[in-house]
């Protein structure tokens, strides 16, 4: 099973796929971010929304979900945010939901779809923010780093 308890942080788990840690989440403390790149993403989020009224509802699309640590953090930091997560690994999503359930009314909706297909069905100008955090092993899937996909994101 890809969810591995973290012995240093009771209640927290690593998501390990293909021998690599893909995500780390402590559902009781969503503000606790362990991976450095996730901390950096949180700083970008804070900076990018510094001028947006905290009461204003924003919409976020996540390409990749794993343990949903970034969506959980956003729901903690900015309650009321509407979030759609495109995560094609149905088995992983089911296990995460079973062992690490989302808080009630978190605003997080997980779609069992890859990022490219998920973004293609979104209305233009749907999202205020897109988080690309998808991996196939240690790499971002090639179809998510093309000029065509980036053009699709900005429509």
Predicted regions and their residues:
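N-terminal auxiliary segments of SAM/dcSAM-dependent transferases
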Residues: 1-18
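The AdoMet/dcAdoMet-binding core of the Class I SAM-like
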Residues: 9, 31-155
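Short Gly/aromatic-enriched secondary-structure transition segments
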Residues: 18-19, 30-31
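A short, flexible beta-alpha/helix-coil linker loop
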Residues: 20-24, 135-138
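Segments forming oxygen-rich coordination pockets for charged ligands
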Residues: 26-28
């Amino acid at each position: 099973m890809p969810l591995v308890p973290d012995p240093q942080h009771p209640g927290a788990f690593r998501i390990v796929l293909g021998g690599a840690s893909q995500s780390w989440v402590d559902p009781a403390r969503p503000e606790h971010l362990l991976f450095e790149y996730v901390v950096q993403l949180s700083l970008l989020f804070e900076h990018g929304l510094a001028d947006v009224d905290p009461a204003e509802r924003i919409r976020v699309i996540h390409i990749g979900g794993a343990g949903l640590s970034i969506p959980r953090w956003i729901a903690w930091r900015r309650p009321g945010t509407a979030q759609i997560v495109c995560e094609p690994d149905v088995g992983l999503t089911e296990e995460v939901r079973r062992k690490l359930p989302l808080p009630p009314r978190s605003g997080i909706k997980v779609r069992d779809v890859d990022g490219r297909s998920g973004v293609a069905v979104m209305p233009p100008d749907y999202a205020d923010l897109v988080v690309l955090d998808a991996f196939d092993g240690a790499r971002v899937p090639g179809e998510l780093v093309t000029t065509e996909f980036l053009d699709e994101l900005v429509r």
